[in-house]
Amino acid sequence: MADSDDEYDRKRRDKFRGERSDSYRTERRDERRPISSSGGARDEWNPFRGSSAAGGGGGGGARHRPDYSDYRSPGGGGPRARYGSPGREMPPAKRMRPDWPDEGMRSNPRFGGYDPYMMQAWNEHYQSLHYSHGGGHMPIARETSGPGIGNDTQTQPAMLTLKQFLDTQDENISDSEVMRKYTEYKTDFKRQQLNEFFVAHKDEEWFKNKYHPEDSVRRSDEQRGFLQRRSSVFVELLENGTIGSVKVDSSQADPLVRVLDMCVIKLEGGTDEDLKILDEKPKEPLVFERKIEPIQTTAALAAATATPKSPKKNENDNGVAVVVSPQKNDLKPVNSDEENWETDKKSDENDKNDNEQGDGDKKGGESSKKQLKKKKKTKKRKRKSSDDDDDESSSSDSESSSSSEEEEDEEELKKKYDVEDGLRTEQKAEQEKDKKEEEAIKAANVEEQPKAEEVQEKIEDEKEKVEEEPKPDVKTEAEAVAEPDAEPKKEEEEKAKEPEDEEKKPETEETSKMETENGESKEETKPTPEPAVESAPAADVIEMETETIDLDKVKDGPQPRALHRTASIFLRNLAPSITKAEIEAICNRSPGYLRVAIADPLVERRWYRRGWITFSRDVNIKEICWSLNNQRLRDCELGAIVNRDLSRRVRPTNGITAHKQVVRSDIKLCAKIAMNLDERFRLWVDEPAPAADGKGETATDATNGSSSGATTYGFNTKNPVLQNITDYLIEEASAEEEELLGLSGDQNDVEGEPIVRDEQLIAVLDRLLLYLRIVHSVDYYNHCEYPYEDEMPNRCGIIHARGPAPMKVTSNDIQEYIKSYEGKLQQFLTKTVLLTDDDIKDLGAKDAETEVEKFVQANTQELAKDKWLCPLSGKKFKGPEFIRKHIFNKHEEKVDEVRKEVQFFNNYLRDPKRPQLPEHPGTTKRPEFEPSRGAGGYRPAMYPPFGGLPYGFAPPMPMGGRGGGRGYQARRELPLEHQRRVIGYHDLDAPANSDRENAF
């Protein structure tokens, strides 16, 4: 269905109006003609007569109907732009924001004011090759936003082909001269691109860390320090047998993870005490959740442990939840306190009702009351065995019974009930004095907390002693107070409680007397079953108290630190102008900040970088992430998100790696990689560089199997992993036996052979694999290196191990696997050789003295005869030689900066893997399509070679459309075999002679 708006506009256009006949609705045409008009309707027809654009603003004319298009224009005046459907004028759908800003190619202060060298970097030498387009240069903004620039990747500008370059030269030039000039042009073009890239990025931190003469040395020393620290940790683990006890197999994921975590803890400065945290993994979630509890819960725990004068008061008041909650709800450590507080209150109310009934029965008679007490005790024991509710009822029991008669009855009952009754008497006596001691407790709350912990530790020791003794002999617990072994502990407890509470000592003595009486009465009666059951609640009370104190000790006391567990934040957008110090300044405001890592920029991301900020595990990482998202650094959004923990730290690889032949090949490759990396960072060697080069040569000879290299391969290095490595590099085979018996491997090649594991070779390989992974951050089975791992949140986070082995494997598969793996590891096997001085001269290397001379000449200005000015200081001199002397004496730091700048640029040129913009796709594909161009050719006058679309993928067509005209045609992109061939004419009447065939 056609669009109604477009149909309406089509009918209103002047193009169709003029083609209609005069007899076609003349009356309607008269209505549209202005009253004051005397000419034809076509001459004075104005499509915008309803708007202010009509001549004279419409004054003096009749009132006409406003144009329908005026109501649909975005600005309210004038017609809608005539392209597309009016539905496209609706607000555009919100698209997802990418990981980096879209305006990175433009100068926008929102993203740090970073403006990559779009058009300002072209040299004046190439400006002469720019040609005008329609009276001026092509509009850069429109061209850069075209479809060819939809990709985020920046590229170099397209380089002229030989044919295009020939069009710029004189017609009488010779072929040799053309080739010479074209070679010079390509060399100058490459120099220009390198120079522009250096100028654009020389002030950025990542670029300085690579090539600046001072910053690069500082960075390399820092990395070497990291490697030396890692190597020392590896040697320590190798000597104590930790490395040798683990195999790099996916089936041993847990031991591998443990070894990696041990390395991380050691790298973080941990001790052997901190390594114990690896055995306490189930306790980590509880400790972490307790630290993020609300403030009220933490205050309740602190109040429960900071009242040593009345430790049982917490059981009767709000402290009951603190004691019982860890035991009742072990599966919900976070919400256990809040949930149990409500249940404890309900149980307290029920126990008070039971106590009232007990008081009424007591008046009936003493004997009946004792029977009821026994029934209540039995009922409470049953509840204790199910869900520990008798502790709550016993505590509320003692709270309700406060009369003196009940105290006497309790003393008589304690002759039959041993431990629990003594504790109840102690609780009752303490509750009577709680009100008097409350003010003193609040005043000495902070000072008494450490003493309370000491007391509870001694109570815990007593509890352990009681648990070791047999349960039927519960009377020994009461008699233990009088024994010499228990007397010092009791005296220490009383001494610790004396400064806290003066009345605590009489209570202890009274309790000991009661326990002694209970012991004497127990010798007479000996109710063996009942005291055995009664002792359980008392021990549980002590155990619950100890657990509550332990929760606080985990937080406050010296405990193993989980240094291998961290929390981190990922920064998606970091402009190249942002430095690491600026990020550290922001992160230092947050608690628990450890380090920050910034990745190298990528051309695909328009040189924006990514970052990882590491914090300790016990911080509120989401709150810190929220605060970072609310901050802007140099008007750049950081894009902070919470970084998840690693999901799978041990990942399997092909199981064929366990085969003996593959293992032997892997040992060779690992040894080569280890020696190359050790030589690059000068590890394990104290000799100068030539000795290291000689060592590398011997390593190569040993790998090839030469006898001379084999004797010196392992002994030329102090690396303990590479010593005596040549014993495992020589292959063995039963060649003579197979020849005599006439055996051949053809049958095995067809059917395959089973995987053969050589445990001795695998042990040697595993040491090399762990050395590369721990020291050099190289994951061999993943054939990659994890860069800047010492600054990342997870050090030694991921490792690839041998997976399950297949049943059989052919020799062809083994050879293909070894060959492909060696190709993937070429980046580590080949040494990085810097370019020589002769090589960098062709790339535009600079000379320090020449640049200093240029600097002096640039700062020597002649004002008049015998009057010269130095712009650096503003002083005037009589001659240029005085200015030269002045610059070298007074501005020596400026001269040094010039020399450093020259060395900076030359270091960039020496790197064979230097970063630079990728070549233009048109430049790389040009040789394939160049012969297919027609005679029409390409005229640079129609298209500026560098101006219009410097970073596009497809060259724009200058004049014509997609078909004819000069320029690049559509089928130019097709290969030769897919293009149309020239249709020739063949005369059928001509004789069958190929020489006379004429093709037109």
From Swiss-Prot:
Keyword list, A-Z: Nucleus, Phosphoprotein, RNA-mediated gene silencing
Modification Phosphotyrosine occurs at: 83
GO biological process, one term: siRNA processing
Residue ranges, compositional bias (Basic residues): 370-384
Principal subcellular localization: nucleus
Localisation per UniProt entry: Nucleus
GO cellular component: nuclear body; nucleoplasm
Polar residues composition bias: residue spans: 700-713
Biased composition, class Basic and acidic residues, residue ranges: 8-34, 342-369, 412-441, 448-478, 486-527
Disordered as annotated region, ranges: 1-104, 302-539, 691-713, 911-940
Quaternary context: Interacts with cbp20, Dcr-2 and pasha.
Official protein name in the record: Serrate RNA effector molecule homolog
Species in which this protein is naturally found: Drosophila willistoni (Fruit fly)
